């Protein structure tokens, strides 16, 4: 999900790349495709059914009461995981502009001492976080919220789960629902839930077309598709599926991106967003990988070069890395196939930590051109295994893989070790540096601000954020291993081999040349006009933009 913070004409964007299948929402809504006119099912007194909108005879958007109940319990517990990852305050929603939060806190606040709430930190340690939260919830009964289905499917992905602890938590959740009369709260908010669903359908008109695209690409139809907005979780989305014989139900559990008019909004298909495409794809990709995992198992060492980064994103092993790589390659394929080739390339560049995503993306082109041979995605898995084998051989089992640092890496290093923000060359460089400094301080980073001329030898060996003009004498030392070289008004990309000239702004994150254990975040303008703003997406290693803010290249 991306957010823009504005200060005068200066913009600093930190794009959070979310775990477990999180992708960005679009800032603009584009009307694409047509859907069946939605029909709303209101929640009546004593009816134990979710608030739901039907987009077709197989596609539903609903507020699942089981998920709502469990997310309320997580909110009441307010653990660090909730605050840092899914708390609505992360997208500017609070009790003043989002009345639903106020209602939840006022109605359920007196019950914070109940067992279910007290168990949340323990359940997070157990692994019930991110996607596991809604997955746990849909195993509960819609009638009384007790355990209604075995945990077997959850254990396939998380074999270390303590089923006795899951049973205990389920009992505590049911007790919480009964004690608080949760159904009363749910019924009283039926109008809010239905407004949320209606706005979702309005914001995402291409949903029916997306379902058709996915079923055609993967060669398999689902019995039903259920999109579940989560009004208490922001920023993250999760995919899941359940099977009952030949019947497959595909789920997408979606956190929201903003609040407008007291209603949560998320753009999951509009404006080139692949939020929903990503989550739906997991329901086809994950089981295909599971059925053929023995083909990929010999290449598990490919996880090692990115293990630390992926574990931070809640992707703890090679199997899940495969899930995410194949799904993210599908996102790019979907964008290209639906008339957004530039966004497809941008999608790939944002996913460089999944370092063989480009290889899989190219393989999908071959798959699409030979559907007479590969009727389903499952049929293509042996070929994908050969693609991964080639990557394994070319990288010596991952030993030769180099992952360049990103804005996210710099922010994490600065959060731990502090940073010095230094500027030189012009008034515009100082103005931009002051904004970067203020942004760091708001993010809890221990930062200093000073002109480049005041940098000490000790400063140079720490994490640096440098805002410079292209005539800076520091550039010669900084650019020895940088992906982009700047010389006056000319910029050369070592990544693409392209040369650009004019009023340009370059952003780079590099290893500190004076101390390999630290990082340097650099913004260089070929003239003062180019330093009018900054886009520092978390996934970026570098970007080149002109002074009109047009993106020329990134990676």
Regions found by a protein language model. Name each.
Residues 1-42:
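Secretory targeting signatures
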Residues 36-84, 141-145, 159, 338-555:
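Solvent-exposed alpha-helical segments and adjacent loops
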Residues 48-130, 306-367:
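Metalloprotease/metallohydrolase-associated module, dominated by Zn2+-dependent proteases
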Residues 155-157, 238-270:
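Active-site scaffold of zinc-dependent metalloenzymes
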Residues 287-315:
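Post-HEXXH active-site segment of zinc metalloproteases
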């Amino acid at each position: 999900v991306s957010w823009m913070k504005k200060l005068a004409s200066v913009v600093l964007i930190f794009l959070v790349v979310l775990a477990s299948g999180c992708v960005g929402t679009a800032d603009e809504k584009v009307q694409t495709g047509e859907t069946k006119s939605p029909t709303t099912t209101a929640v009546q007194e004593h009816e134990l059914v979710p608030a739901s909108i039907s987009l077709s005879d197989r596609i539903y958007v609903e507020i699942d009461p089981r998920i709502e109940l469990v997310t309320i319990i997580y909110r009441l517990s307010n653990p660090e995981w909730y605050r840092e990852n899914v708390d609505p305050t992360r997208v500017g929603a609070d009790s003043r502009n989002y009345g639903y939060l106020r209602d939840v806190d006022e109605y359920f606040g007196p019950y914070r001492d109940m067992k279910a709430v007290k168990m949340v930190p323990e359940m997070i340690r157990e692994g019930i976080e991110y996607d596991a939260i809604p997955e746990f919830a849909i195993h509960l009964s819609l009638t009384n919220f007790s355990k209604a289905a075995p945990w077997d499917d959850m254990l396939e992905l998380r074999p270390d789960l303590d089923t006795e602890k899951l049973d205990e938590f389920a009992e505590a959740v049911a007790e919480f629902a009964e004690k608080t009369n949760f159904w009363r709260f749910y019924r009283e908010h039926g109008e809010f839930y239905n407004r949320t669903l209606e706005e979702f359908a309005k914001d995402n008109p291409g949903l029916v077309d997306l379902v058709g695209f996915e079923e055609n690409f993967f060669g398999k139809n689902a019995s039903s598709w259920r999109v579940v907005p989560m009004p208490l979780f922001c920023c993250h989305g999760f995919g899941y599926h359940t099977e009952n014989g030949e019947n497959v139900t595909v789920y997408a559990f979606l956190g929201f991106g903003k609040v407008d008019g007291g209603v949560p909004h998320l753009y999951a298909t509009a404006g080139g967003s692949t939020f929903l495409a990503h989550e739906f794809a997991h329901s086809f990709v994950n089981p295909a990988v599971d059925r053929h995992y023995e083909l990929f198992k010999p290449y598990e060492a490919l996880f090692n070069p990115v293990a630390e980064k992926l574990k931070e994103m809640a992707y703890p092993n090679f199997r899940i890395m495969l899930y995410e790589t194949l799904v993210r390659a599908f996102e790019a394929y979907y964008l290209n196939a639906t008339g957004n080739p530039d966004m497809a390339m941008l999608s790939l560049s944002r996913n460089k930590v999944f370092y063989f995503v480009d290889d899989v993306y190219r393989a999908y082109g071959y798959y699409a051109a030979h559907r007479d041979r590969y009727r389903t995605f499952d049929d293509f898995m042996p070929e994908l295994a050969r693609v991964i084998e080639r990557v394994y051989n070319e990288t010596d089992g991952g030993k030769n893989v180099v992952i360049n640092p990103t804005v996210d890496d710099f922010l994490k290093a600065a959060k731990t070790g502090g940073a010095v923000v230094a500027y030189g060359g012009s008034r515009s460089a100082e103005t931009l540096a002051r904004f970067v400094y203020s942004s760091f301080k708001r993010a809890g980073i221990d930062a200093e601000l000073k002109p480049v001329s005041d940098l000490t030898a000790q400063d140079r060996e720490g994490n640096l954020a440098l805002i410079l003009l292209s005539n800076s004498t520091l550039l010669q030392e900084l650019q020895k291993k940088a992906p982009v070289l700047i010389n006056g008004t000319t910029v050369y990309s070592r990544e693409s081999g392209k040369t650009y000239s004019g009023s340009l702004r370059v952003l780079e994150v590099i290893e500190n040349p004076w101390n390999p254990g630290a990082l340097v975040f650099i913004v260089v303008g070929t003239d003062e006009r180019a330093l009018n703003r900054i886009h520092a997406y978390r996934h970026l290693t570098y970007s080149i933009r002109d002074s009109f803010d047009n993106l020329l290249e990134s990676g």
